[in-house]
């Protein structure tokens, strides 16, 4: 997205300042039922009337399934204020994962999640959890850069 728009990409770990920004775009990976860094980035933040927030989630789950989107958005509601959630333009993209390239801590987190989910009968799993179980330990790439186009159009409207 940064390459296609010329907008700078800043890691949530750098605690970016938003007060002087008209448009804020947060792009985060889905991990363990939440959007990585979302809650810490927007803790105690209120969007001004002149600001626009775009949140983009990226994961391996099939975002054509309404139940997957509902699961993601329900999780997001627990991560950010109601004001931010209501005002945000939210997009859900599919990305890729390669377990061999994950850090040791991420692999450990995924292993714990896998172990936990395996104990739940398959028919009782959410579609997001089923996708996790189906791709666990493998490389999976669902990236389609064409799905950036609606986000770029939204950015250009401002």
Language-model region placement:
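A short, Lys/Arg-enriched amphipathic alpha-helix followed by its capping loop at the start of a domain
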Residues: 1-7
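Generic structural signal for residues in well-ordered beta-strands
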Residues: 7-10, 90
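Short acidic low-complexity segments
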Residues: 9-20
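Short, solvent-exposed polar/charged micro-motifs at secondary-structure junctions
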Residues: 19-23, 100-102
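Structural motif
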Residues: 22-25, 52
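Short glycine-/small-residue-rich Rossmann-like dinucleotide-binding loops
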Residues: 29-30
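FMN-binding flavodoxin-like domain, especially the glycine-rich phosphate-binding loop
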Residues: 33-158
């Amino acid at each position: 997205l940064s390459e296609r728009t010329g907008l700078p990409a800043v890691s949530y770990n750098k605690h970016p300042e938003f007060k002087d920004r008209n448009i804020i775009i947060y792009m985060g990976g889905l991990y363990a039922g939440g959007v990585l860094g979302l809650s810490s980035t927007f803790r105690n933040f209120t969007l001004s009337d002149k600001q626009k927030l775009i949140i983009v989630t990226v994961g391996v789950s099939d975002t054509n399934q309404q139940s997957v989107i509902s699961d993601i958005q329900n999780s997001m509601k627990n991560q950010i204020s109601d004001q931010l959630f209501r005002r945000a333009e939210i997009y859900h993209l599919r990305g890729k994962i390669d377990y061999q390239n994950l850090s040791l801590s991420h692999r450990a987190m995924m292993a714990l999640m896998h172990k936990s989910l395996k104990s739940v009968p398959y028919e009782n799993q959410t579609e997001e959890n089923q996708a996790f179980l189906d791709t666990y330990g493998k490389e999976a790439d669902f990236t389609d850069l064409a799905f950036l186009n609606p986000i770029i159009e939204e950015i250009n409207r401002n």
